[in-house]
């Protein structure tokens, strides 16, 4: 079937609403949302499809200075997203001032030499007035050429359809095959690990910030009973982090498990049995083998 087709990279500094935006577009939870930076690790790819178009949306990790091999992976994911994209959505949010991180992203867009750039004003409802938004747009236009500007509120699902229709103006017509759909489809394993990791980020505050990985040990689905049994492990870097994650009398690990189980039930509409263990892998973020085993690709 011939449709308007393209790859769209959603870029911007951490916590400007990229994950909320892609979730609003897809109308389901595919990218973890937290008020802490670096909550999106993999470049999340999801396919949006309607009668006239098929679009792969890529929600990129936030760019940051690398301090270990995992950080290098994260920045490599961003580079790939920019190169593959037919359209780039540069997201800026009205509840935060522009800073050096925004201009780092702008420089990356310029280096990628992309023409189809759409400025997305996120959390437009947080602006004092329209003049404040217009001032932001005018300032950014001095630094990079945007083809279009769309004001949205992803959380309240305002102007999401307008954004999708704007994107369609810059797509090309192509044959959309089953291979295309399979390539874009997210694996259940990724969704499970991201949701568990989100619960860690939400509940642990800054005690065990980002030295947390998640591994699926077992996944069995009983179709007749509509029952999914999942066993997973939270990977940490230090023994001293273990009692923090487990909590007194297991209260924290129980809280993480219950939060993840509730979200998985809402997404998959089945009974979820989730058991979470804690494993210590010293300095795992600098261990290529462990990074690969957790589903991350290493830049060669």
Curated annotation (Swiss-Prot):
Its main location: cytoplasm. Transmembrane segments: none annotated. Residues 12-19 are annotated as: G1. Residues 38-42 are annotated as: G2. GO terms for cellular component: cytosol; plasma membrane. Residues 122-125 are annotated as: G4. Residues 59-62 are annotated as: G3. GTP binds at residues 12-19, 59-63, 122-125. GO terms for biological process: ribosomal small subunit assembly. PANTHER family: GTPASE ERA (PTHR42698), GTPASE ERA, MITOCHONDRIAL (PTHR42698:SF1). An essential GTPase that binds both GDP and GTP, with rapid nucleotide exchange. Plays a role in 16S rRNA processing and 30S ribosomal subunit biogenesis and possibly also in cell cycle regulation and energy metabolism. Monomer. This is GTPase Era.
